[in-house]
Structure formats: structure tokens, C-alpha cells
Amino acid sequence: MYKNFLLAVFPLLIQSEKDAFSIFDLDFWNYNAGIVMNFGDSYDDFTYMENRMDLNFFKNNFSAWLQYEYSDPPELGFSIKDLRKYRIEYSSGPWSIKYGDIYEVWGRGLVLAQLDDQGIDFDNSSRGYLINYLSDNISVTQMSGETVNAQLGADLRHPEFEFTHNIDATNINFEAYPFSYGLSFLQSNELHQLKPLGVMDTVDINHRLHGAYISWFGSNMDIFIEYMDKQSKSRTFQTNFSGQEIESLTPLKRGSAAYFNSNYYLGNWSLFFEYKRYSFDRLNPVDTDYIINNYGNRIDYQVMPILYREQNHSFLGRAAHQTNANDERGYQVELSGGLSNGFQVVTQFSHLSRNDTWESISPIEWNRKNISGLLPTTNFSALPYLEFYAELNGYLLNNRLQFKTAIGTNEEVTKVNRFFKGLSNTISENWTYTDSIWYGEDWFYLDSQIVSMDTSINQIETMLYQKSKSFTIPIDLTLSLKNGYSVGLGLAYQERYKNNVKKGNAGGFYNYADSTWILNDETNPNHSSNETTSNYPNETPFQINRMFSLSIGKASKWALTLNYDWTNVQEI
């Protein structure tokens, strides 16, 4: 189908020129090029070399983009020495057509947001075609294509899994100032790989996403709301007596997502608020595999807002939250504005958690309870995350010295191994020996019998979870000199805590015969322990990170930066 589409579009380019063969002359086109080269080496043989060249051609109503990559090996993924990306575009009046690697963003990405992130080897573009009709107050987009995504497994550098999506999607957007409306639909047939390498073990899944969004713009505020509903079904195929292949769909999972944001402006100050509730899958706090074995939930086309601050400092980025796009709710508030002396202030707070609290009835059986209302919880079994950030920046010395200082803190429960709080029956058996024999210099017991059983009801509490928190202070100074020269100085200090927290009057032992958690001390059921241990080597209480950077440069010409980063203990 795609080849036929290209054959239909290509003659338009030929016919639009008097000399048809002139399109093969490089001087015929307006063009530009860009090159990205990355190289890295380390003492543990982690070597990579990445080279990418982008070429952009444009002439009249036509444009084209090519990307050639020579990476052997890349930082992440498999080696490539070939044309990696291409796209041609043609527009005429209200119509535009694209063929090749398509990147689109609809709404805030609850249905579709396509991007290419080389840093994490993520690319959810679709190779196919897109047709768009745009008039004064309406835009209609229809696209179809195929996406092949690679996923890491046990090997953290080379992908071991592959997911293939064939999609058809439509987006309609209406403009009626001060309102804007949108409707989205996406259907994907996914071939989902379950086992790495070797013999392929796959499952066929059909995903259907329906979404709607609306925005409103006022004189001192704006509002955006988006909601989507998702259904997934497993696909099986059977051949009937006539030799026809019949598709059968079986319901698999159903989920939804809601997102809201609003900006309020008052003079030099602005208040930003956003809220999310994503619910596509529910896994207990021990099971974190939302990708390989638990399928039918969020798909890679859904790149949704995360609702915590995207940091540009490496220390703050290291402590960032690992978002859960399948099961998470929360909000973020940011207040920013200018002071009378010209300084700028930014403050931000974020609170996230899962949609349920969890209780481990046994080490392998969990019960969940939905969190009431709309807001997140601080209950540790819902894996809460809290973040605070404050920044002050501005200029001194007649605007020659630019400074930025900040403080960032966060706290998170990353994993819950067990949590039970309630009544439990404890059964004690009393045995007596009924037969014995003297042999050598000692008695040997040959038989015994139970004489009594005591049952007691105790209040049980047992919990074991992992908790992390951090405290970071970065400072950046940049002094402007004459003739465009500048000198920069950066300092940063960070403390990171990673702890195991163990509490309760029962430990991790469970009696499956009696279906009860075993007390630490059966003679004293009320005896409870409270223990916090560090996850860092040698029981180091916390990690201290420090960074020093010095940079010298000339505007629009060159820059040289020296970074020195040291820590008191390495990660496990």
C-alpha cells in the first residue's frame, strides 16, 4: 500500500517542473545539513561511537528529510550503518501529504505523541503516510503506518524484545475562539513478543483508543482538559471449512486517562496547576513488569505528562521519579514571578501515588483498595512520591554576573515487599512422647502424640518496604567579560538516602498451612520491632555527591568545560 501511495505522489513532483530531470540536480533544491557526532569510552569497556547526518531539502510545495546514521556500536541499541529516517512532504492549498517516518502530537499525548529520543533509544514514529486537511477553523488528520519498537531485557545495552504496531489514526480539531476542541481515534494491531531471542513466542493484541480534549484561553488564564478511553482485546485466528481465516477478539483490558492543566497570570507572577489520573493496569507493589508479561495496557504511542519537574541538573535528574504511566495519579503546582530587584523566583511542589493501597494477605497474594476521591495518598503501600523545588535567579554587577541557586528535595517509596495489618489466628500444638528405649548411654524416643492445641487471636502488623529521599543544592555563576568572553562556575552538593524499613510484631515468615503470619515472639505477641537499614555498601547511612565545574567560552564561537564529580559511596 505504501509503495502505491509513493508512486501516486511522485509524479506530482515531476509534473510540477518544466524539466522533469532537474529534480535530480542538487542545485535545484534549497537544502541544509546537520551532523551529530558522539564518542565515549570507559575503563569497563563501555565504548560507543554515534554519527548522524540530517539532510533537509525544500523547493516550492515540496520538502524532504533524510537521516543517515553510522553508529558502531551505539550507546544503546544495535549497530546501524544505513539510512535511518526519511520523509517527503507535499502541500497544496488546504491539503498536505507526508510519506515516510511520521511524528505527530495530538492534545497532550494521551492518545498519540511521537518522538525520537536517542538518549534512551526510544523512537515511536510510524513509517507510512499522513493526509491533513486544514481550513480556517477545522483540521482533519488521517495517518496509517507501522512502528517497530525494541525493548531492553536482561541486557541493559542491547534490546531483547520487539513489539510491532500497525496503526490507523484520525484526529479532528475545531477552532472557535476562545475555545479549541479535538477528537482522536487510534487503532493498533500489536505483535507482542514474550520471550527474548530464540524461538519467538508472541501474542496478537488489538488496541482501540478514543480521546477528546478542549482548551479555553482568557485574558489572564487558560485551561486544558483531555480524557481518553482505551480497550484492548487479544486476537486469535482460525480457519473455517472454506479455508477462510476468521479473526476472533477476546476482551483483555480496559483503562482510561484524564489530564487537566491551568495557568493563571497576575502581573509578573504566574500560577501553574496540573492534575493526572492514569489507570490502564493494576499490579501489586512487588510486580513492576508492565511491559513484557503484563500486556494490553498503555502502548508506546501514549507519551503523557509526568507531573514532576524535568530537571536540567545531573544531580537532580539522578534522583527523579520513575513515572508509572499505567497506574498513577497526582498533581503539580508551580508558582513563579519577578521580585522588585529584578530577581526571578520559581517554586514547585508535586505529589504522586498509585490509584490503590495494597495489603499482602500472604507473600504471594495481595488485596487492593481503591483510593477514594481524586487526590493521591501518602500511604506507603501506594508508592507515594513527593517533590519540592525552589529557585532564585537573576543578575548582579550591572548585569554582568548571572546567578542561579536552588534547593530540591524529594521522598519516595520505591517498593513494598510485604504489608499486613489485622487479626490473625495463631495455632500452637503440644506434643508428648509415648514410647522410648534406652540405647547406649541415652534415651531414644520412638513415638509421640499431640495432647492439646491452643488457638489464639493476635493483632498482626508486618511491613517491609524500600524508601528513598534526597536533598540537593546546585549553584551556577556566569560572569560576562569583554569581547564576548565569559567564565562560568558551578557547584553542587547532594545527599541521597536509600533505606529498607522493617516494622511490626511479625517478620517475613508465613505459615501456609494455617494461613497466618508468624509472630517474632509467640510468648510476647505485643513485642514489635522498628528497623531501618541502609541499602548502600558497608552500611553507609547516605550517599554524598559533590560536583565542581568550570567553563570558559566566547559567544557563538567556542566553549570549554571541565567537570569534576565525586561521591563517598557507589550505587549498588
Where are these regions (language model features)?
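Extended hydrophobic/aromatic-rich secondary-structure runs
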Residues: 1, 73-80, 316-321, 334
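Positively charged n-region of N-terminal signal peptides that target proteins for export
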Residues: 1-4, 341
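Sec-dependent N-terminal signal peptides
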Residues: 4-13
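Beta-barrel outer-membrane channel/assembly domains of diderm bacteria
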Residues: 16-113, 120-144, 163-176, 183, ...
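Sequence/structural signature of outer-membrane beta-barrel proteins
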Residues: 34-42, 69-75, 95, 102-117, ...
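Exposed, low-structure sequence patches enriched in small/polar residues
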Residues: 44-50, 203-217, 222-572
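Electropositive, surface-exposed helix/loop patches at the edges of structured domains
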Residues: 102, 133, 139, 172, ...
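Solenoidal tandem-repeat scaffolds enriched in leucines and small polar residues
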Residues: 148, 152-205
